[in-house]
Amino acid sequence: MVSFGGIARKLFGSSNDRRVRSFQPNVTAINSIEEKTKALTDEQLAAKTAEFRALLAEGKTLDDILIPAFAVVREASRRVLDLRPFDVQLIGGMILHSNAIAEMKTGEGKTLVATLPVYLNALSGKGVHVVTVNDYLAQRDAATMGRVYGFLGMTTGVIVHGLSDEERRAAYACDITYATNNELGFDYLRDNMKYEKNQMVQRGHNFAIVDEVDSILVDEARTPLIISGPLDDRSELYNTIDAFIPLLVPSDYEIDEKQRSANFSEEGTEKLENMLRQAGLLKGNALYDIENVAIVHHINNALKAHKLFQRDKDYIVRNGEVVIIDEFTGRMMPGRRYSEGQHQALEAKEKVQIQPENQTLASITFQNYFRMYDKLAGMTGTAQTEAEEFGNIYNLDVIEVPTNLPIKRIDEDDEVYRTFDEKFKAIIEEILDAHKRGQPVLVGTTSIEKSELLAERLRKQGFNDFQVLNARYHEQEAYIVAQAGVPGAVTIATNMAGRGTDIQLGGNLEMRIERELGEIEAGPEREARIQAIVEEIKELKQKALTAGGLYVIATERHESRRIDNQLRGRSGRQGDPGRSKFYLSLQDDLMRIFGSDRMDSMLTKLGLKEGEAIVHPWINKALERAQKKVEARNFDIRKNLLKYDDVLNDQRKVIFEQRLELMESTNISETVSDMRREVIEDLVEKHIPERAYAEQWDAVGLKTGVTNILNLDLPIEDWFKEEGIGEDDIRERLTEAANAAFTEKAERFGDDIMHYVERSIVMQTLDHLWREHIVNLDHLRSVIGFRGYAQRDPLQEYKSEAFELFTGLLNNLREAVTAQLMRVELVQQAPAEPEPPLMQAHHLDPMTGEDDFAPIYQASEVIVAPENRNPEDPTTWGKIGRNEACPCGSGKKYKHCHGAFEQV
């Protein structure tokens, strides 16, 4: 039966349809001036940029010049790239310009769409940032689309890992800057640790277009970017505590897979207290006494390491190191680490060398970083399922852009089997059948373990004609993805999300040319070979189309519908036919967590035999409801975490703004004088209480404070004995004495040196106290949840205590700066420029207590002797010169072999 909502949508169209239609008049206007724009010479077309900028200088708005600007970009794209944006792509560009998210299906040309609003907004001269998920995509898109911007007289920069500050500054100074979300966030944090404004690299946050916006603003929303420095080695403690966990029995702890949490029962707590007491690690009588907070943290991490984290699913052990596997993409993240000691707990569990912990020096979440932009937009193929979150947190609407050609993909109902083995047997039969028919197959799995299990079972069937794409073999993933659309190809992939390379039926032309013709110089031979490849791909594409297009087989449903939709969306690009189907079993994680026991008994009663599947739209709906529950829970977690993070964010803004003011100032004497006055106020208030009798005044305490902080030897006891003296008199005498001592010192130093010393001491002290403050807030955050047991709101308690800590930070700053300046003495050589601390970049995931960590760069920098390289294992090669022979033995240069796709 059709609902009233359905009838209304048929009559009036959905709200999305109405939003899309609202852009149609502009599309018509752009089309109406297309011929006129085509008639312009290259020079006249390029001159339009200066013309538009002049109009903006006269007071016109970006909206006023949208129509001619879009027409100019469309024509420039046609001339430079031989790509003319379709009408729906113009609509996509307008959606991005209007501070919204454009949902565009795979293969609909998101990269080209971005050029329209990027050019328009870059005309303001304030800079536009195009955000991608990895360095490879940033470089690829900047190189390709930079040709269009360059043709129109605009500069394009790209920020990737490994650039110097000078190179970064130059890239940010360009009209358009392509960068990864990580590099942008880390540059912001590093800028706010600099000591001179001219050392900073970013120039503001005007407009950002975020590609794969759901991945960055939802999946990674909970993952703070962290700059940290090393702490003392505590590996012995980790090993000691790790040895306790195997001695526990299941009744000693409770595991909640839904919440990704692990807690000890009363029995378990008693056991641990005895073990800790014997090891000399327990302070006091009870484990949960305040002095044992650090030990509780360690044992909780050890329990999670053993009971929640699974080897080959959450991480792998490679070359004696624990390497994280990205939950969403299935890729290894070498160099990244879980924070808060969780990675060390895993290292202790796996009996590998325990790396030292790090102290947070600065951090920010993507949620708070991207909310700094004056204007924000995003692109993705899957955003509707998270529309509420984008609206609530980022104030971004999600608008679905119609496809240029209708989607012909057939999404079949799920097949649900009782056991894992039955499901895999059915999947293998389906793969072999599709392969015989010449249909390309993409099989999506949720973990490395399952992808390799499927591969092993295929081999047992005597079938070896397949490729495996997961974290262990990611060196070759770009080429594997590019060839996944060849007739009969079978590709097994761990979570295809974020792969960054299109699956084109027949194969990827650019990839094949690069791989096969990289050594051949331009000329007739190269052109002939290219033409032969073009014809071959055309023929292969026709065969794949005849066989039904790309067939996506999913071996399990993910917690998020969006990840499932991303996998499905790999098929049926640009109007091609395709097919998708999910194969499930009652032993799958999602099914098990959401009551598969009841369903199993029901299916047994219904007489479902071994090897039979249940297929019904109701099953799909039930699973989607389960996924919606998980998504809603995850959204609530992210929303709640943001409330806590906003407390730190507000304080961070105050500190960073204060630092910027200090960097921009050449003379902060007035600020220093105010600090000194307030310190004296505090000293007097502390030792001469209001309305107290003179006999109750603390002369000894005040003298000690004056000596320690103001570095003055004053007859305070004698002052206190004077007849009729009041606290105002004491305050005035202290102020005069401190000011006189400081003025005398300033005259000896000279104005320039004194101003430099003041600024250096204030900034270094502020940085030191801010780092301590971050650690204190982390500790507060880790225990504040227990206030809920006392019927108090943990968030309000956190806000209140965080404010007290911040007030304490400001008081300590005034006191420490005053004490240092009253003691500082001039040496013969000028003081050295303060050095930033030893730093590492990390990427934390607080939702599960995990931490994505990011010195991503270490492994590839090691030089390995040729005789120690295994040709079949790229992880043993180390750093290789671009023009060296590829260690795999192909005979090609590294840049034309494995090096061609190492950054994907």
Curated annotation (Swiss-Prot):
InterPro entries: Helicase_ATP-bd (IPR014001), P-loop_NTPase (IPR027417), SEC_C_motif (IPR004027), SecA (IPR000185), SecA_CS (IPR020937), SecA_DEAD (IPR011115), SecA_motor_DEAD (IPR014018), SecA_preprotein_X-link_dom (IPR011130). SMART domains: SecA_DEAD (SM00957), SecA_PP_bind (SM00958). It is a peripheral membrane protein. Keywords: ATP-binding, Cell inner membrane, Cell membrane, Cytoplasm, Membrane, Metal-binding, Nucleotide-binding, Protein transport, Translocase, Translocation, Transport, Zinc. Its cofactor is Zn(2+). CDD domains: DEXDc_SecA (cd17928), SF2_C_secA (cd18803). GO terms for biological process: intracellular protein transmembrane transport; protein import; protein targeting; protein transport by the Sec complex. The keyword Cytoplasm applies. It is an enzyme of class 7 (translocase). It comes from the Bacteria. Zn(2+) binds at residues 886, 888, 897-898. ATP binds at residues 89, 107-111, 502. GO terms for cellular component: cell envelope Sec protein transport complex; cytosol; plasma membrane. May bind 1 zinc ion per subunit. Its EC number is 7.4.2.8. GO terms for molecular function: ATP binding; metal ion binding; protein-exporting ATPase activity. PROSITE patterns: SECA, SECA_MOTOR_DEAD. It is found in: Cell inner membrane; Cytoplasm. Pfam families: P-loop_SecA (PF21090), SEC-C (PF02810), SecA_DEAD (PF07517), SecA_PP_bind (PF01043), SecA_SW (PF07516). It catalyses: ATP + H2O + cellular proteinSide 1 = ADP + phosphate + cellular proteinSide 2. Belongs to the SecA family. Monomer and homodimer. Part of the essential Sec protein translocation apparatus which comprises SecA, SecYEG and auxiliary proteins SecDF-YajC and YidC. Part of the Sec protein translocase complex. Interacts with the SecYEG preprotein conducting channel. Has a central role in coupling the hydrolysis of ATP to the transfer of proteins into and across the cell membrane, serving both as a receptor for the preprotein-SecB complex and as an ATP-driven molecular motor driving the stepwise translocation of polypeptide chains across the membrane. This is Protein translocase subunit SecA. It comes from Rhizobium etli (strain CIAT 652). The gene is secA.
